[in-house]
Amino acid sequence: MSKALIKFIRLSPTKARLIAREVQGMNAELAMASLKFMPNKGAKYIANAISSAVANGGFEANEVVVKSCRVDAAAVLKRFRPRARGSASRIRKPTSHILVEVAKAEVKAEEKKTVAKKAPAAKKTTTTKAPAKKTTSTKKATAKKES
């Protein structure tokens, strides 16, 4: 397993995490190919981190899998924009750290799948309701109580 860490990228971590979730568990070669056609700014940085992690381990891109791709928040650059009446509003420019781990792909032997049999359907039984108690109307009940 090899790692690559790119620090202080001028990119919002929430936007980069959307792309990082897409490539987790993918083959590294396939992940880099799919990131190449994504229009997002973070796709370029994540593809760079994946290729760096593959090179750090001395692997070929087609024989490794992206085990994890994590995007953490880094320091936030704070800038000010002048506003009306001498005030100013704060502008936040977030940065992020990208950590990519790649590992050798495990080749799984084809195992014979056993299909679980369905349980037999339950027999339908008809239930009869107990007869409801007869209720007397309220006018009749109050008339009987008074007399």
From Swiss-Prot:
Signal peptide: none annotated. Residues 117-140 have a biased composition (Low complexity). Residues 110-147 are annotated as: Disordered. GO terms for cellular component: cytosolic large ribosomal subunit. It comes from the Bacteria. It holds the Pfam family Ribosomal_L22. Gene3D superfamilies: Ribosomal protein L22/L17. InterPro entries: Ribosomal_uL22, Ribosomal_uL22_bac/chlpt-type, Ribosomal_uL22_bac/org-type, Ribosomal_uL22_CS, Ribosomal_uL22_sf. Keywords: Ribonucleoprotein, Ribosomal protein, RNA-binding, rRNA-binding. GO terms for molecular function: rRNA binding; structural constituent of ribosome. CDD domains: Ribosomal_L22. GO terms for biological process: translation. Part of the 50S ribosomal subunit. Belongs to the universal ribosomal protein uL22 family. This protein binds specifically to 23S rRNA; its binding is stimulated by other ribosomal proteins, e.g. L4, L17, and L20. It is important during the early stages of 50S assembly. It makes multiple contacts with different domains of the 23S rRNA in the assembled 50S subunit and ribosome. PANTHER family: CHLOROPLAST 50S RIBOSOMAL PROTEIN L22-RELATED (PTHR13501), LARGE RIBOSOMAL SUBUNIT PROTEIN UL22M (PTHR13501:SF8). This is Large ribosomal subunit protein uL22. The lineage of its organism: Bacteria, Pseudomonadati, Campylobacterota, Epsilonproteobacteria, Campylobacterales.
